[in-house]
Amino acid sequence: MKKGVTYPLKIDTNLSTVSSSVNYNDIECVDIKSNGHYIVKFMYREWVGPLNLMTTQKTSIKISIDLKEQTVTCTHTDKKKTVYRWGEFPNKKETEQNKKEDNPVQYETFLSSNFNSEKYVNDLFTHKTDQQATVHLQYLENRKLGCIDHLKKDVYKNHLIFIGASKEIANSEVDMLDFRNLISDYGNVMSSLQNISISWDHYKVKKSGKIDFEPLSPATEPIQWLTTAPNELSVSIEQREFEVAVGLVEKINKIYESNPKVEIVMQTHPLKDQIENKVKILTDKLMNELRSPLLKANQIKDTISLLVRLSQNDKAKSIFLESRSHSINQAIKKIVFSGDLNRFIGELARVIFNSINSTCNDFTNSFPSYMNSGLVSWIIEELVLISDIFNRQVFILDNFYSISQAIRIIESHCEMMDQTGLSIGFYWNLLLQPHVEQLIVNYEIKIRDSMLHQLMDEKWNGVSNWDYEVKSQLNSLPSSLKNSGTPNSGGSGISNNNSNNNNNYQSPIINNNFNSGGGNKKIGLTFQQMHQDNLNNMEDIDQGRLKLTSSTIFLNTIIQKFAIDICQIITIDLIPVISQSLGSIFKDYMSYLKNEIQKEYLSDTQCLAIISDSVYIVDDLVSRIATRFEDATGEKLNNLTQLSSLLYSYFESIRDQYSTRKALELVDNSMNWEEQEYQVEEELDPFPKNFIVLSEALDRLAESIQTNVNVESVLPIASRIISEIVNIISNRFESTSNLVFGYGGLQHFILEMKYLATFAGKYPVEDSTFELINTMIRNHKEIYLNNTSDPKPLKTEEYFTSIIDNLVYQKAVYN
């Protein structure tokens, strides 16, 4: 049924149980409400309700609408009904055809006494195909459903109507019996009244006589006063005499306490509701008074005192603190941010902390001490408000000096609150901690992103005039930071103390660009600017000991700026997150160096530049940055030992990878060493040419390492290369199992190995390397003796020693 549509109606005589003399031609759907109720116009009236039960005020008839059957049923008071239908009536021709349809079932068959159901079914389906059997079963199912529908309409429905009518008749009989009894009682009462005789003289009033009343007992006067208490309360409340009104309430409570029976009676007396209503009005009035921001301290105290006397402690506390929070929010909205962050934070702190101080004084003067926990919770909520403003206004800056100044402003107010007896500094630090930690983490992410961009453009060319010191203009720093360090720690937050540096490197001081307009600059841009300034200033710096690539110089710049910035806001509680951030930065960089040195296209100079970078980070930069944070807090970084060990393992891996690569290059390219040369029988020249070439190549490599890295790295790298060369030679002999040395080849091999052991002795080569050399000599001697039928005697030890001593002497004289 759609809104605004009129449906034409006709009476359905088949379903109607009563005829109607009036034929209503249509029904109109006026409106459909949101709750599912319909408004329809029918019988010149408006009907309201759900479709299954709609009523109107002008008649007792009820109607129901069936949208599926398209019928409107009018139920009268006598349970009879008139049914109207819109749309088409059921087709009578189809009904007659259904009656006349061919019925394959002979019902007389089931009446026979000899009826056998199994035989009947077998005979019925024996000559039928599957399709015919399916059609027959469908026919039986349709007949079954039709039978059920007829039962519902013709039997069960009439049965329910009959049961309902029987109940109505029974109820009517009971009502008639009650009515008859009432009539009988009324007749008896009237008869008794008519038989009463009254002596009217007895009831005549004597004019001269006075009626004496017994005076009220003092004990009953308070009870009598209760009847006037609501009026007195109303007058006091309207005249704003709240003290008097509260006194009346207390008087009522005393009457209840002294007269328990009165309290019991008042539980069901209307007077109690009147009194409670007046007390509620009084309480609401006092609550509204307490919400007013214009109240003075003594007025607040008096109002709260009245509410406490009314046993409204919790409500008074809640409303008092809520009103103070509202006034603080209104005051904050009036603060105008003109661009000066410190001024804005100072005004914000003044408003909030002054309100907290006055609220604490009013609260302690008005409420009992056991309710102070609610005050503490409220103070923490206000501190949360400040921390949220900090997160939105302060921690979005990149100027850490401005951030530290803003934090110091709040801390100074907390210190003033401590002097008044309210210690809230701990709560403030607790609320600020997550925001500062997130600030450090964001700083770390920016550093790692900037470092990655720098590494993508790295050519691995060491800068020859880099000496570990970055120039800065200390004049750009505030005077308080040049000597005293951070505002928070009171210590040397920016320290040049390098007592832990074994190489006597000077710690670079980064220009922090602390100016009033630096707060909105992007940190990545600041890093690039500082890095470019450092490169430009290198022309005036003396020759340094290490050559660093541009990415390491960049890392040195940004990591020291990170230390200077964080030292301005650092506390001991921030040590864990700082340790984690530093560890992530250094591990990422060293891991990148480790992966980069494995690339085959890098030249020898580029590989040494990578080693130089790793040496600088492991031996100098990490310890220098850790010392700076230790000077600022007095505490060491949590993971310094583990971080140093991990970074050193990265450094060793970088050095070993280079040594392995260089050893293979020397064996294949410089020495041109081949194991087949040792198969000759004739004696060779007693001159170990390949290993003399190796010795000279190692000397040149040592000079290159000293030039491109430092002196300290020469011996570890050279010794590692020698060990790798010995391993390569041993592995190649093992892979060539059928190799048999000739007499001359064996003599030459022994000479080369002894010469290799001689010049390897000036390097800190592992003992296992010398053992491997002796093992190879011994094994090949045994193989020669076992595979030669008439072996020649080998040269003595003195023979090889004299040749090697002569070669060493000639090299020393030549050099």
From Swiss-Prot:
| Primary site of residence | cytoplasm
For the keyword Transport, the answer is yes
Q: Would you say which domain of life the source belongs to?
A: Eukaryota
Spell out the SUPFAM superfamilies in the cross-references: Cullin repeat-like
Region of interest called Disordered, as start-end residue ranges on this chain: 479-511
Looking up InterPro entries in the UniProt record yields:
Cullin_repeat-like_dom_sf, Exo84, Exo84_C, Exo84_C_1, Exo84_C_2
Gene Ontology biological-process annotations: exocytosis; Golgi to plasma membrane transport; protein localization; protein transport
- Give me the stretches of Low complexity compositional bias: 494-511
Q: Which UniProt keywords apply?
A: Cell projection, Cytoplasm, Exocytosis, Protein transport, Transport
Compartment(s) where it occurs, according to its Swiss-Prot or TrEMBL record: Cytoplasm; Cytoplasm, Perinuclear region; Cell projection
Record's Gene Ontology CC terms?
cell projection; exocyst; perinuclear region of cytoplasm
Q: What does this protein do?
A: Component of the exocyst complex involved in the docking of exocytic vesicles with fusion sites on the plasma membrane.
Q: How does it assemble?
A: The exocyst complex is composed of sec3/exoc1, sec5/exoc2, sec6/exoc3, sec8/exoc4, sec10/exoc5, sec15/exoc6, exo70/exoc7 and exo84/exoc8.
What the record says about family reads:
Belongs to the EXO84 family.
Please identify the protein, giving its name as recorded.
Answer: Exocyst complex component 8
Q: What is the gene called?
A: exoc8
